[in-house]
């Protein structure tokens, strides 16, 4: 259950002194993407922030811990997917290499009808994700432990998602091999990237095609109230990924398809 102190739109905390952090950073940022944030959703984001900071003291979840920066660089940035693709209706979404839950948990908060699966290779991060899911009262979302190379071979997950997203730091060729096998034919793979992705797209052209994908669009935006340029690459799934992909653990990174 979310603590009642989070019912207020303005949240106070003590660090070197009394500091008031206005959640307008969140609501204004999401509004720039055409997203309205309810009081209940604001409450959930604040509880998420508290858990993130609490767990970050004992494990490495994020280097970004300041309230305003988390609201903008993690929460608002995660929600930008709504700027690139339609998220209405009951779609199944997989977040590969989710880490502390970005973008999957913010997307679930904003789009509660989404069925979300969070995938991470570190079990202790999965324990954190399960704590967040429970404390925020989220349903229709699960966190699983495993490597994408292994989980993508399982019938339950392979080719079963309408949307696959990732904010993981990896070149697009490698990331495509990790993610495209999960996408159903007709679905989308949307990686979050910093700055321009033109060169990455060019270098990943063969990999995307081999894996059954097709480049559709590039959605560029500046994170509201910052000078941070972000890009969402929209890649469609036009045919099934050959069974030999993804290759064994580590290969997509060590020897990207080129």
State the predicted function of each range.
Residues 39, 65, 145-147, 217-219:
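Short loop/edge segments at beta-strand edges and connector loops
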Residues 186-196:
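Conserved beta-strand signature within the Rossmann-like core of class I S-adenosyl-L-methionine
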Residues 125-127, 197, 201:
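Short alpha-helix immediately C-terminal to the canonical SAM-binding loop
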Residues 79-170, 176:
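Conserved SAM/SAH cofactor-binding pocket of Class I
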Residues 202-258:
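SAM/dcSAM-binding transferase cores
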Residues 2-90, 94, 124-127, 131-141:
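Class I SAM-dependent transferase core
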Residues 111, 183-185:
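Helix-to-beta-strand junctions that scaffold the AdoMet/dcAdoMet cofactor pocket
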Residues 1-17, 243-252, 256-258:
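Basic Arg/Gly/Lys-rich low-complexity intrinsically disordered segments
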């Amino acid at each position: 259950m979310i603590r009642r102190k989070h019912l207020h739109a303005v949240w106070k905390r003590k660090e070197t002194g009394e500091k008031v952090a206005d959640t307008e950073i969140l609501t204004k940022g999401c509004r720039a993407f055409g997203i309205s944030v309810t009081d209940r959703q604001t409450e959930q984001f604040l509880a998420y922030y508290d858990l993130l900071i609490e767990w970050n003291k004992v494990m490495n979840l994020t280097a970004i811990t300041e309230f305003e920066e988390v609201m903008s660089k993690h929460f608002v940035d995660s929600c930008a997917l709504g700027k690139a693709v339609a998220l209405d209706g009951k779609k199944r979404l997989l977040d590969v290499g989710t880490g502390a839950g970005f973008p999957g948990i913010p997307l679930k908060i904003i789009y509660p009808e989404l069925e979300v699966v969070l995938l991470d290779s570190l079990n202790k991060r999965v324990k954190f994700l399960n704590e967040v899911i429970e404390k925020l009262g989220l349903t229709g979302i699960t966190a699983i432990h495993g490597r994408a190379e292994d989980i993508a071979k399982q019938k339950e997950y392979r080719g079963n998602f309408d949307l696959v997203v990732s904010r993981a730091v990896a070149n697009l060729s490698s990331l495509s091999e990790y993610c495209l096998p999960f996408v159903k034919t007709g679905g989308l793979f949307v990686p979050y990237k910093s700055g321009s992705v033109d060169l990455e797209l060019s270098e990943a052209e063969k990999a995307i095609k081999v894996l059954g994908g097709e480049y559709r669009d590039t959605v560029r935006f500046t994170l509201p109230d910052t000078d941070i340029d972000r890009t969402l690459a929209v890649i469609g799934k036009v045919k099934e990924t050959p069974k030999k992909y993804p290759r064994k653990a580590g290969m997509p990174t060590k020897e990207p398809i080129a």
